[in-house]
Structures are given as structure tokens and as C-alpha cells.
């Protein structure tokens, strides 16, 4: 997918292995000599917001985003963005559109992404249009491995267990 500037979008509830799979794909890309960066959406926004406030956005976009052939952005949708952050995030997606590849993870279905992007349906539609145009969408279902581990250890009860 990287050779064709395509994206991978991993969608599913918390704890089903989206981040693990994204990191494994990034590791394989790195082994193949592809310059790769992994960052959480929160850290990416902190980097971009700081650069914007310091009038250094163009340089940071080049150094932190465009310099990579594969950018992995983890946890889109866990924290809502204000309008400025949503605009900065859109700039990342637009900058890489057909010029690089993205792997993104999210716990939200696409129909709820506007709740993350400052309730801006127009920006969300434009962002999804670019992200999904050349994308492999991988829905992941299942029980959280973290909760499963806790249940196996007897630390929490399954639904329907007697008290």
C-alpha cells in the first residue's frame, strides 16, 4: 500500500489490537527501509499547535510530517479537537494526500468523526474524502484483550456472572 500512497484505517473498540497492528505494519515498513513515524493524535496536535503558536508550522510540517513516507497516527477520536486543532489535523491529511501513506486508528465509526473535529461536518467530510480515497479500511471487532485478561485473572466479572 505504501508504494501506491494508499492509507490503512483501523477502526474498532478499545483494546482489540488496532495500535498493535499499526505498530507491526510500521515495523515491517521500517525493516523495508521506509522512513516511518508513529505518533498519537494528541501528541501530533500538541506538536502542531506549539509550532503554529511559534510561527514555525511550515518547518515543523516538513520535518515532522512530510519527511516520512509512512505516518502512523494513533487514537483519533479519543479526545475532541477544537476548531484550530481540527484545521491543523486537516492540513496533515491534505499534505500527505497522494504523496505519502497513513495508518490511522480510531475507536469511532466514520459517522461520528465530526464529534472529534470540532463538530465541523464540512471539514470532517473533506478530511474523510482525502483519507479514504485510497484506503484499506480494516474494521476490527471483539472483546478488549485488556478486559479479557482481567476477567481471566478473576479481577472483574463477566456480564451475567452471579455475585
For the regions a language model picked out, list residue spans one by one.
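Walker B motif beta-strand of ABC-family P-loop ATPases
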Residues: 70
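Conserved P-loop
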Residues: 1-66, 116
Amino acid at each position: 500500500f505504501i508504494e501506491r500512497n494508499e492509507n490503512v484505517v483501523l477502526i474498532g473498540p478499545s483494546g482489540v489490537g488496532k495500535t498493535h497492528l499499526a505498530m507491526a505494519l510500521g515495523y515491517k515498513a521500517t525493516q523495508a527501509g521506509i522512513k516511518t513515524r508513529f505518533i498519537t493524535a494528541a501528541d501530533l496536535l500538541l506538536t502542531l499547535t506549539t509550532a503554529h503558536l511559534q510561527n514555525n508550522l511550515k518547518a515543523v510540517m516538513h520535518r515532522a510530517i512530510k519527511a516520512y513516507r509512512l505516518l502512523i497516527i494513533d487514537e483519533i477520536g479519543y479526545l475532541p479537537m477544537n476548531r484550530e486543532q481540527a484545521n491543523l489535523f486537516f492540513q496533515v491529511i491534505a499534505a500527505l494526500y497522494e504523496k505519502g501513506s497513513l495508518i490511522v486508528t480510531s475507536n469511532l465509526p466514520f459517522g461520528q468523526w465530526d464529534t472529534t473535529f470540532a463538530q465541523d461536518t464540512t471539514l470532517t467530510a473533506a478530511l474523510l474524502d482525502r483519507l479514504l480515497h485510497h484506503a484499506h479500511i480494516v474494521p476490527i471487532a471483539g472483546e478488549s484483550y485488556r478486559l479479557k485478561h482481567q476477567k481471566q485473572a478473576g479481577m472483574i466479572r463477566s456480564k451475567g456472572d452471579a455475585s
